[in-house]
C-alpha cells in the first residue's frame, strides 16, 4: 500500500510552495 500511496500522491505531496517542476504547477492549477 505504501508504494501505491507514494505513486498516487506524487504532486499532492509537493504541491505547496515546492514549485520545482513546471508540470506540478500545471497539474495544481488544473486541479484547484
Swiss-Prot record:
Any one GO MF annotation of this record: toxin activity
Disulfide-bonded cysteines: none
Keyword Signal found: no
Propeptide: 1-10, 18-32
Cyclopeptide (His-Pro) cross-link, renumbered residues: 11-17
Post-translational modifications reported in the UniProt record: Processed by the macrocyclase-peptidase enzyme POPB to yield a toxic cyclic heptapeptide. POPB first removes 10 residues from the N-terminus. Conformational trapping of the remaining peptide forces the enzyme to release this intermediate rather than proceed to macrocyclization. The enzyme rebinds the remaining peptide in a different conformation and catalyzes macrocyclization of the N-terminal 7 residues.
Keywords: Toxin
Keyword match Methyltransferase: no
Domain of life: Eukaryota
Family affiliation: Belongs to the MSDIN fungal toxin family.
Purpose: Probable toxin that belongs to the MSDIN-like toxin family responsible for a large number of food poisoning cases and deaths.
Protein name: MSDIN-like toxin proprotein 2
Species this protein is from: Amanita fuligineoides
Amino acid at each position: 500500500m505504501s508504494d501505491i500511496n507514494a505513486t498516487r500522491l506524487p504532486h499532492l505531496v509537493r504541491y505547496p510552495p515546492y514549485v520545482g517542476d513546471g508540470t506540478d504547477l500545471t497539474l495544481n492549477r488544473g486541479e484547484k
